[in-house]
Amino acid sequence: VCRAVKPDVTIMVDNCYGEFVETVEPSDVGADMIVGSLIKNPGGGLAPIGGYIAGTQKCVDRCAYRLSAPGLGQEVGANLGLMPSLYQGFFLAPNVVSGAVKGAVFTAAVYESLGFRVVPAASEERHDIIQCVELKSPEGMLAFCKGIQSAAPVDSYVDPVPGDMPGYDSQVIMAAGAFVQGSSIELSADGPIRPPYAVYYQGGLTWYHAKLGVLLSLQKMLDAGLVTLP
């Protein structure tokens, strides 16, 4: 559609959360450049920092020249000894992402069966690892996030509480007991405390860990009297 209007337009796609979910990437279907974060899908849980740029030679070169200087591009710059972790994480990423997608589908199936609205539905096609569950109340969000946090390998004893965050006009609750701060390929959940009280669940370095997190979120909902099992 874009090129029908302007054939020479440059198309860039922010592919965060979408890498390795489908059999093709945006660059396979016409995007000139795709960008994303290495502490999300493509880092496989091992990359401690960083991002990536991929695409046409022209786009990549222009980005590199902007980062350093024209003519120098990718030939200069520190890698801080991180390259083995980045390469290994990238190698493992497709398998890690498949576990996260299974976890998202499982989450949708569980909460859908209990009468909650989920987006996407368990049977719908997926384009990223994020699963939205509308929990109907602040108490539901709190219980869900406590369950996710209790499954964490780091800070599992912590109880998430809502707090103020820049850019939001309501408080936000977050559960993220991760090895890498901010990593959303690791098991995590968050959302603003406002109607429809939707929590956004994502990640899990393994399918089994994702499943544990979902089951513990359900247990916390049960303990709080917010859900009844059939």
Regions found by a protein language model. Name each.
Residues 9-11, 32-33, 51-52, 130, ...:
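Structural motif
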Residues 170-230:
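PLP-dependent enzyme catalytic core of the Aspartate aminotransferase-like
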Residues 81-95, 108-175:
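Conserved small-domain helix->loop->beta segment predominantly found in fold-type I
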Residues 1-98, 102, 111, 117-119, ...:
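Conserved PLP-enzyme active-site core in the AAT-like
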Residues 61-70, 145-153, 183-193:
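Short, basic, helix/turn surface patches
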Residues 34, 53-59, 135-144, 178-181:
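Short, structured secondary-structure boundary patches
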